[in-house]
């Protein structure tokens, strides 16, 4: 019984020290076709650039850009992967990879995973987000909700505005 109580206390103390914060990002901008391979009327590979701006719930406003690879078969997205760059004030940067969870062409949902970041905001590395994206002609709007450590949110909040 003492061992069980000790294990529960250790687990409780461990989880108490791990706190997470919701980090909300909104991006908008233009989608630019870089290259496409048209295999048939319904099958293709397209490489896009997304360029625009973002704002977050920590009061930041910055630039964003992405490189997106899309494979479509029978007019259905079978694979979509992207690398996204966020550029904050003072050239502070964070990078995440995106994977789409659905197969619609004009809108989508998926996950981001932060892979790299400037030293001043490096606590965001390994954080995950759920995102949704919607296209209108060559414009896009993305909303993301990220579960990041409290330390990462404080680092992001401390970026000079």
Predicted regions and their residues:
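Sec-dependent N-terminal signal peptides
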Residues: 4-14
């Amino acid at each position: 019984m003492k061992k069980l109580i000790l294990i529960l206390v250790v687990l409780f103390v461990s989880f108490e020290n791990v706190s997470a914060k919701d980090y909300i990002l909104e991006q908008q901008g233009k989608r630019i076709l870089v290259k496409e391979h048209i295999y048939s009327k319904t099958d293709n590979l397209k490489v896009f650039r997304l360029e625009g701006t973002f704002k977050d719930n920590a009061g930041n406003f910055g630039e964003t850009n992405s490189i997106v690879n899309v494979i479509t078969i029978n007019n259905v997205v079978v694979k979509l992967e992207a690398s996204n760059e966020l550029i904050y004030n003072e050239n502070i940067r964070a990078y995440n990879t995106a994977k789409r969870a659905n197969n619609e062409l004009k809108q989508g949902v998926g996950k981001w995973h932060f892979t790299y970041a400037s030293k001043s905001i490096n606590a965001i590395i390994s954080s995950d987000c759920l995102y949704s994206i919607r296209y209108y002609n060559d414009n896009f709007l993305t909303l993301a909700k990220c579960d990041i450590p409290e330390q990462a949110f404080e680092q992001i909040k401390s970026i000079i505005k």
